Regions:
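Mid-chain, well-packed structural core segment of small domains
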Residues: 100-125
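Short alpha-helical scaffolding segments that buttress acidic/His motifs in well-ordered protein cores
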Residues: 71-75, 92-99, 127-132
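Acidic, glycine/proline-rich low-complexity segments that act as flexible tails and inter-domain linkers
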Residues: 2-88, 116, 142-158
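Substrate/cofactor-recognition hotspot
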Residues: 130, 137-141
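Gly/Ser/Thr-rich beta-alpha loop segments that engage phosphate groups in nucleotides
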Residues: 51, 104, 138
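Short amphipathic alpha-helical surface patches that mediate protein-protein
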Residues: 112, 129-132, 148
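Alpha-helical scaffolds flanking conserved acidic
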Residues: 86-92, 121-126
Length: 158
C-alpha cells in the first residue's frame, strides 16, 4: 500500500485538523509541550552539537518529521536520558555498535560527541581495537579511518 492509499483509508473526516504550528520548531512540540522532546533535544544538542541538530530539525518535512521526533524523544529523551549509564559510557558503546554496523557517517558524528562527553582519544582507540576482535578487521579498518577523520576535523589529533 502506498502512502496516499494509506492516508486515504486511515483519515477520518470527524477528526480535528492539526493545530497550526507557530513555526518556532518546524512542526515539533513547542517548548514545554513535551518534556521528553525537550529533554531529548537538549541532550542531542549537547552530544552532537547545536548546528547539526538544528539543521536536522529545520530540514524535517512531513515525511521525515515523525522520525526526527521519535529519535529526539525515544533515542535521546528515553535512552540517553536514562541516568543508569553516564554519557561517556554511552558514547563508547555507540562507537562499538556503529563499528559493528559499519555506519561510518554516524560513527564520525558520535566520535565528535564522545569527545564532548569526555572520552579521550586513547579510549576511542581502545574501543575500536576491542570492536575489531568481535566485529572483524574490515569493520575496524573502516571505523578507524572514519574516527581518525572525525578526530582530525575537530583538532583532537594532528
Amino acid at each position: 500500500m502506498d502512502i496516499l492509499s494509506y492516508k486515504q483509508t486511515n483519515e477520518r473526516s470527524d477528526m480535528e485538523p492539526p493545530a497550526q504550528d507557530s513555526g518556532a520548531r518546524n512542526g515539533f512540540p513547542a517548548p514545554g509541550e513535551s518534556p521528553l522532546f525537550d529533554q531529548g533535544l537538549a541532550l542531542r544538542k549537547k552530544v552532537l552539537g547545536d548546528e547539526y541538530v538544528d539543521r536536522s530539525i529545520e530540514a524535517a518535512d512531513d515525511f521525515t518529521r515523525p522520525l526526527q521526533k521519535m529519535i529526539t524523544e525515544w533515542c535521546w529523551g528515553e535512552g540517553w536520558g536514562n541516568p543508569a549509564l553516564p554519557p561517556k559510557t554511552r558514547s563508547m558503546l555507540n562507537i562499538a555498535m556503529l563499528t559493528a554496523l559499519n555506519r561510518k557517517e554516524e560513527l564520525k558524528l558520535h566520535v565528535r560527541g564522545a569527545i564532548r562527553n569526555g572520552v579521550s582519544v586513547e579510549e576511542i582507540q581502545a574501543v575500536l581495537l576491542q570492536a575489531c576482535i568481535y566485529c572483524g578487521v574490515p569493520a575496524a579498518l573502516d571505523s578507524t579511518k572514519a574516527a581518525r577523520e572525525a578526530l582530525k576535523d575537530i583538532g583532537a589529533i594532528p
